[in-house]
Amino acid sequence: MNRSEALFYRYGIRPILFRLGRGDAETAHERTLHILALISRSRLLCKTIGYLTTIRDQRLQRTVCGIPFPNPVGLAAGMDKDGVAIPAWAALGFGFVEVGTVTHHPQPGNPRPRLFRLPEQEALINRMGFNNQGAASLARRLARLQPAPIPVGVSIGKSKITPLEQAIDDYRASFRQLFPYAAYIAINVSSPNTPGLRQLQDADQLRALLAALQHDNAELGRTDQRGPRPLLVKIAPDLSDTAIEEVLTVCADHGVAGIIATNTTISREGLTGVDPRLAAEAGGLSGRPLIARALHVVRLIARLTGNRLPIIGVGGIHTPDDGLRMLEAGASLIQIYTGLVYYGPLLPRRINRAILTHSKVQQ
């Protein structure tokens, strides 16, 4: 994608999307996802879009956690919770998709409005609350998709109606339903929008959760030709460096395959030039203001683990340069979400093209 194409999205397409639903960000999200779901039903249309947008080059290929990825640029969880548009994401040049976060029980999420744009900072605030159709529904949809066009990771979280003391059983139910269809499974213990969820990052609670899931993983893997699935833990950017080190110790003790760093932040530090009423909205902040903290966390994890633990870097990646910086910081793969909102569907191609011109981040 050259500069003129980027400008066309920014000044031609984006203003139209931002006006949908009288400016309601979630309405624009829903309508865009509906269009992508329709595109996903047509193999010919997906093939045509893929021909125009996807860069296929062996130098982009990665094998991470034993999974072959056609390129390192993925779609972050939250964009397509119920996995309705996976073929379209593949056609747009993503190397993998993480669907979810999905919960055992279907749930509507928090009351609307719950998604807010901060265009001055190229950011979003969301308090969606894991709105999704449930693990069983996602499992049925993924079963129909097999074989998937690109690796599909599945992010699982706790149902809102499930008490924290029963969280392990809730995660296990989702895990067992989705195991057959997931390239990897991400354990989301870091969303700020489900009451009490972040407590599961505490060492003792995380240890118990991972032990239970790895028990199921080993059991299910014995009868599956692909064996156990890689388990990744998604952490919050708001953890202290000491807390991150404790999480890494627990993850190492329980055979976690990688870390996803990071989720959205509850901090509003450095958020300037925006409507104070928007900045005060409850929820997780994503986008441009998160990049510095996300890079710090990725560098910290890479240093503490001696670059031996795979990291999926996510948070504030809006440009090819952001993607390169994340890979240079130690990420094995990267994910985008808010950058897609502000810079358009050809962002994966721009990042992959940049990777090909920078030998430091080629495999």
Curated annotation (Swiss-Prot):
<feature type="binding site">
    <location>
        <position position="101"/>
    </location>
    <ligand>
        <name>FMN</name>
    </ligand>
</feature>
<keyword id="KW-0288">FMN</keyword>
<feature type="binding site">
    <location>
        <position position="188"/>
    </location>
    <ligand>
        <name>substrate</name>
    </ligand>
</feature>
<feature type="binding site">
    <location>
        <begin position="77"/>
        <end position="81"/>
    </location>
    <ligand>
        <name>FMN</name>
    </ligand>
</feature>
<dbReference type="InterPro" id="IPR005720">
    <property type="entry name" value="Dihydroorotate_DH_cat"/>
</dbReference>
<dbReference type="InterPro" id="IPR005719">
    <property type="entry name" value="Dihydroorotate_DH_2"/>
</dbReference>
<keyword id="KW-0285">Flavoprotein</keyword>
<comment type="similarity">
    <text>Belongs to the dihydroorotate dehydrogenase family. Type 2 subfamily.</text>
</comment>
<dbReference type="GO" id="GO:0106430">
    <property type="term" value="F:dihydroorotate dehydrogenase (quinone) activity"/>
</dbReference>
<feature type="binding site">
    <location>
        <position position="81"/>
    </location>
    <ligand>
        <name>substrate</name>
    </ligand>
</feature>
<keyword id="KW-0665">Pyrimidine biosynthesis</keyword>
<feature type="binding site">
    <location>
        <position position="287"/>
    </location>
    <ligand>
        <name>FMN</name>
    </ligand>
</feature>
<dbReference type="GO" id="GO:0009220">
    <property type="term" value="P:pyrimidine ribonucleotide biosynthetic process"/>
</dbReference>
<comment type="subunit">
    <text>Monomer.</text>
</comment>
<feature type="binding site">
    <location>
        <position position="193"/>
    </location>
    <ligand>
        <name>substrate</name>
    </ligand>
</feature>
<dbReference type="GO" id="GO:0005737">
    <property type="term" value="C:cytoplasm"/>
</dbReference>
<feature type="binding site">
    <location>
        <position position="155"/>
    </location>
    <ligand>
        <name>FMN</name>
    </ligand>
</feature>
<dbReference type="GO" id="GO:0044205">
    <property type="term" value="P:'de novo' UMP biosynthetic process"/>
</dbReference>
<feature type="binding site">
    <location>
        <begin position="126"/>
        <end position="130"/>
    </location>
    <ligand>
        <name>substrate</name>
    </ligand>
</feature>
<dbReference type="InterPro" id="IPR050074">
    <property type="entry name" value="DHO_dehydrogenase"/>
</dbReference>
<feature type="binding site">
    <location>
        <begin position="263"/>
        <end position="264"/>
    </location>
    <ligand>
        <name>substrate</name>
    </ligand>
</feature>
<feature type="binding site">
    <location>
        <position position="188"/>
    </location>
    <ligand>
        <name>FMN</name>
    </ligand>
</feature>
<feature type="binding site">
    <location>
        <position position="234"/>
    </location>
    <ligand>
        <name>FMN</name>
    </ligand>
</feature>
<feature type="binding site">
    <location>
        <position position="262"/>
    </location>
    <ligand>
        <name>FMN</name>
    </ligand>
</feature>
<feature type="binding site">
    <location>
        <position position="316"/>
    </location>
    <ligand>
        <name>FMN</name>
    </ligand>
</feature>
<keyword id="KW-1003">Cell membrane</keyword>
<keyword id="KW-0560">Oxidoreductase</keyword>
<feature type="active site" description="Nucleophile">
    <location>
        <position position="191"/>
    </location>
</feature>
<dbReference type="GO" id="GO:0006207">
    <property type="term" value="P:'de novo' pyrimidine nucleobase biosynthetic process"/>
</dbReference>
<keyword id="KW-0472">Membrane</keyword>
<dbReference type="InterPro" id="IPR013785">
    <property type="entry name" value="Aldolase_TIM"/>
</dbReference>
<protein>
    <recommendedName>
        <fullName>Dihydroorotate dehydrogenase (quinone)</fullName>
        <ecNumber>1.3.5.2</ecNumber>
    </recommendedName>
</protein>
<comment type="function">
    <text>Catalyzes the conversion of dihydroorotate to orotate with quinone as electron acceptor.</text>
</comment>
<dbReference type="Pfam" id="PF01180">
    <property type="entry name" value="DHO_dh"/>
</dbReference>
<comment type="pathway">
    <text>Pyrimidine metabolism; UMP biosynthesis via de novo pathway; orotate from (S)-dihydroorotate (quinone route): step 1/1.</text>
</comment>
<dbReference type="GO" id="GO:0005886">
    <property type="term" value="C:plasma membrane"/>
</dbReference>
<dbReference type="GO" id="GO:0004152">
    <property type="term" value="F:dihydroorotate dehydrogenase activity"/>
</dbReference>
<feature type="binding site">
    <location>
        <begin position="337"/>
        <end position="338"/>
    </location>
    <ligand>
        <name>FMN</name>
    </ligand>
</feature>
<dbReference type="InterPro" id="IPR001295">
    <property type="entry name" value="Dihydroorotate_DH_CS"/>
</dbReference>
